[in-house]
């Protein structure tokens, strides 16, 4: 499979497949394709894994697209202004995505639910208990909100992140919450009560404009009908 990511604010990934090659995606993610791409809808692992995908923000059923009789082309566009990033997934090198980030992947990549190990990170971290775990072997594409900044964390090195800006991280990273120090800072600082701490080793990808922040910014301008 060869691919090209086009566009900046509203990107799309265009994939060129050899005959017989397959890609998986959630329902409704396909933007355009060549006529020889054959679609099959499947639970892809049974009802248990389908329910897990639903918990992680994706649809229960996935579509498998296969290039029939020759080379095929299929494109997947981002659903929100932001970035599409490719990730090379290998056995034992899983990735953790924010909820609903998974866009598409080569057949052989598996999407499942990832529960945060520490209750505090789920209760106060701002994104809930559930994220997405991507495993297997192949290239996976994820869509993130705004631009993406990547950091390589050494063992024990930590970065503190405001709620919602965590886009993805290596499964080797550890996630926890940190309380904002001082009651005055909590009440008047405008940053909330808690931040998320990510500790290496591993890589972390941060997004500049979480969709939740966009929603909060435009909410005061939405007519209420009164």
Predicted features, each with a name:
Residues 1-226:
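Composition-driven recognition of glycine/serine/threonine/acidic- and proline-rich low-complexity segments
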